[in-house]
Structure formats: C-alpha cells, structure tokens
Amino acid sequence: MKKTIPVVGMACSACSANVERKLNSLEGISSASVNLAGRSALVDFDPTQISLEQMKKEISGIGYDLVIEADRSVEEIEKREYILLRRKTLLSWVFALLVMSVSMGWAGITDRYVANQLSLILALCNMLYCGRQFYVSAWKQLTHLTANMDTLVALSTLIAFLFSAFNTFWGDAVWGARSIEWHTYFDASVMIITFVLTGRLLEEKAKDGTASSIRQLMGMAPKTAHIVDGDSVEEVPLSTIEKGDMLEVRAGEKVPVDGEVTWAESFMTPDAAYVDESMITGEPTPAEKRQGSKVLAGTIPSQGKFRMRALQIGEETALAHIIRMVQEAQSSKAPVQRLVDKAALVFVPVVGSIALITFLAWWLAGGNAYLPQAVMSAVAVLVIACPCAMGLATPTALMVGIGKAAERQVLIKDASALEQLRKVDAVMIDKTGTLTLPNRSVDFTKSDDLPPEQRETLKPYAREAMEELQKKGIEIYMMSGDKEEAARYWADKAGIRHYRSQVLPQDKENMVKRLQAEGKTVAMVGDGINDTQALALADVGMAIGRGTDVAMDVAQVTLMGDDLRSIPEAVTLSRKTVRMIWENLFWAFVYNIVCIPLAAGALRLFGIDFQITPMWASALMAFSSVSVVLNSLRLRLTH
C-alpha cells in the first residue's frame, strides 16, 4: 500500500536524503520518496512485513519524526514548531546584540578578560538553548555515520566557540608569549546561529505558500455534518459518520461525504436543489440534484437543501482521492532531483574536507601567526556551504506547479508526467466525449442520416483550446470513428488540420507509435475504455475526469472538467515549472561554487584583500535558501 507520511525535523537536502535512504533500507518497503519542501514521505510498503510504528522507531533513531498518530494534527505540530522557532530566533538576536555590545566595547566594559568571560557565558547560553537542535541533530547523524546541514552549523559554531574559549583563558600565555596578536570570536558563533535560525524562520514562512494549494483542497472538507435521526437533525463530527447514514445538507454548507440524494427542494424547483461543483469539476453553472443524483464531498449547495445517503466516507471520497493524488504527485521526484539527492549525500563530507584543506593551507602558509585566520576561514567555509538551496530547488517548484494545476482542475500524477508534458509537440484527441458532447436537444440516434451538428455539440471553448495549443507549436490530430465527411466537419469546426476517420482502438495505438517514430512527444486525450491502449502508450496520457475509471487509472494527467482550455494551461504550467526548477538549481550550484572559494580566502591568492567572514557567511547561507523558495512562489503570481 502507498501512504504519504508527514516528516518532522528535516532542514536540508541531506536530511531528506538520509530519511529516504533509511526508509528504503527497511525490509517491507518497496520504495520511499521524501519531499523536503512538503515535509513528507511517500512510502510504498507491505503492512504485513512492516508497520508504521516500526518505521517511526527507525526514523526517530536518526533524529527525525514520522507523524503517524491519528490524534496528532500535522498542522498543530508545525504551528507549535514554528512558534518555538520564532521564540528561539528572537532570543538569539537578543544574545547576539548583547555579545556584539560587549565585544565592540559598547557596553562600557574596558577589562578585556571580563568582557571575554561575559561573551563566553552569553554565547554558551545561546548555543545550549537557541542552537540546541543543531548539536542534538549533529550527534545523532554522527552516531549513524551520516551528516547534514546541522552538522556544518554545529561544527562551525563549536570550533569558533572552543577556539575563543581557549584564547579567553590561555591567549596571553600561548600567543602573547610569542608576540602573536589574538582575538575571540564569540560574536561569530552567536551570529551564525542567529542568522541560520532567521533563515529557517523566513524559509518556513515562505514554504507555507508552496503548500497553500493542498491546504485549500483539505479545507474543502467540513469538520461536521448534520445527521438525520428520525424527525430530528443533529450536528455531529464528520469522523462519526458511517456508510448508510442519512444526512441533511443546507444551502451554503459543504457536502460532508460522497453519497446519493434521497430528497431535495429549492425555491426554484420543488424537487431539486442546485449544487456548486466548480471546485471539483471547474463547471461554473450549479448542477441540478434530484432524487438519485450523486453528490461529492466538498461541493456546496447554492440553492435549496437536500438529504442524502452516505456511500463513500473518509479516505474513500472523490475529494480524498484528489488530495491523495496531489500529495503523491508533490512527493514524487523529477529525474534531476535524484541526481541532487546523490550529491547531497556527499556534499557535507566534501565541504568538511574543503574546510580542513583551507585550515591547513592558511596555517602552513603563515605558521602560528596565521592560526586565527586559518580557523576563521575554515569556519566560514563550513557555514557558507548550503545544501538546503539545492534540496529545495526542485520540490518547491514542483509543489507550486502541481498545486497550481490542481487549482485549475488538472491533476498531474507525478513529477515525471510534468517533465514529459513540457516536451509535448503532438496531441492526439478523441472526438466523441472529449471534443464533443451528445446533443441533448434531440432524441439521440445512431443513424448516420442525421447531420453531425444534430447528433453532437462541440464543447464550449474547444476551438479556443485547439488554437492555443497550435500557437505553442503543438500539432493536433483528431481521432474519430465517424465517416470521412463527419470527421472533416468536426475537425474544421474545432480548427484542427489533421484528423483520422473510422478509427478503431488499435488505430489510435498505431497512430501514437507512428508519431513517436517520427520523433514526436505525444499526448493522448481521451475519456473511454477504447482510449486506454493509446493513453497507456502515449508519452503523456490525459483523461477527462468524467470519463471511465479505467481511462483515468491509465492516464498520467486527469482533467476534472469539460473545459479543454485546461490542456494548453497544463502544458504552459509544466514548461514554467520545469524552467523554474532549472533556474533554482542553477543559482543554488552557482552560489556554492562562487561563495565557498570566497569564504576560504581564494581572492587573497591574487592580491585582492577580500574574504567573506563567518558572520556574513551565515547571512548569505540563510538568504540562499529563502531566495529559492521565493523564486518558486513566483509561479503563483505569474500563472
């Protein structure tokens, strides 16, 4: 079975890579994919071999937490963690200002020994409370021979603190005796923690925006329902509803579960109510619901009220299926992310090695006189290196892109489908049920004597959608079972140049193969069982949400409504999302490639007296992560 499990405690790509590696190493788990931005793990496992409790225990051992308890709200946990993070950040700034005041002489303390001891106490308090999680996490990583961003922060601040503490008590005896000027760097150790915490606080706030789509979907389900018990109607928690229960839904309330209408009334119609299903199907016109009509959880009666029998509850509802599909898609990984994950696993050890080389280079070049410079250069390298930006580059863009698509009633199954969708240059579209609808104004007949326009109606905006696709350089091929004359009529009406008439399911499959042989990336759009072969074979299968379950199971993309303009929208969104991923990765890698040498003091080799200090290194590192998240959020504003 597949399950999306919230993960607490991840801070960088090395964290998510460690959790993923641990999960994949457990017996009974066939695959696991961890999403840093979504703070979740998509796990495919055999519940007879491994339980959620066992997974939780294993992950807790490496310093993280899986939220598996039904009574623990993920939102509450995240809110509590955010409040704690904010408190620690504010307090860390207080410690930072106090240490800066003492070390800079602003506090009026002229005795160097007293000033250093006071700075030591303040820095130690900051480390033990505000920075405690860095050291706990680093220790747990060390016991499992792994490393993450917390390892770099813990190592850099400990080095700066211990070197400063050594100088506080033995500086004059060791360095003064050799006429070497010495300093303390308590301000650096405090500011590193302060800037890292500030960065994480801003990052968490920004990441909330990437998850807004899924929260919006989850918010569509009400917390309570009105259950009918004889002549009385009682409001009860949604969790208490069972299959077969009779419920009452009034105008403006959210339908609590999927079910069947048993009675309805409204001001306009005595035996019908009208339900707004736009959030599910995208249709702006309220749907008429009479006795026997199906209603979906999350939809809202706009006129009248009705009673219904609960048929699907909890995880069985269509809304729950949509939420689960979006969560799984957001937790999936684009091909490039797997390379980033591999890089993340070696990133921290490589940075540690560079810091050690930096230290040795400065020390060997200048001897003991350059020891303070060597230590601070190594600390700056440890601090400025940022696997967080690399780890957030892909998942934040994916979360925004896939979430934005869901808001437009387009459900994308996974990241690979999104990647393929941007490459599409040929679209095959089934005519009946996809491009057209049966004409309800006349009695339907299969007689070919009726003109095409009397038998079917072109879907609203179908021609506009086809024109938009062609503007993007995409060729369209209409597939019809009609005779040549009728097929040509509908192709002309929809503005489609290429069409095939009298096609069978096998012909659609052969057409996909032919286009692929010509080097095209093919998307197939269909709604019926006779489209499933072509949907499965195409590079991207796109099913109409009102089609058959078989078609939707095979397809990588599901269009929830009848508005075909969602097809070009999906293509545009996929292109923007993938472009955003590469932008994020480019800047994340450029940041590390440029900043690490600058922190090491490489410019001094060329006579340029410039080097990034540990304090500024921590500020840059924090900014790099936040900038990646904010860049991804541009998708919400530009599409």
Model segments located where?
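Flexible metal-binding regulatory segments at protein termini and peripheral loops
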Residues: 1-116, 216, 232, 320, ...
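Conserved ATP-binding TGD loop and adjacent catalytic N/P-domain core of P-type ATPases
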Residues: 17, 412, 422, 435, ...
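Conserved cytosolic catalytic loops of P-type ATPases
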Residues: 27-49, 53, 183-186, 215-316, ...
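Soluble-to-membrane junctions at the N-terminal ends of transmembrane alpha-helices
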Residues: 75-94, 117, 137-160, 323-355, ...
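Transmembrane helix-loop-helix hairpins at the membrane interface
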Residues: 84-224, 342, 454, 612-614
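Membrane-embedded alpha-helical bundles of multi-pass transporters
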Residues: 108-111, 143, 162, 177, ...
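Juxtamembrane coupling segments of multi-pass membrane pumps/enzymes
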Residues: 175, 188-251, 289, 411-413, ...
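Conserved catalytic phosphorylation-site environment of P-type ATPases
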Residues: 280, 339, 376, 386-458, ...
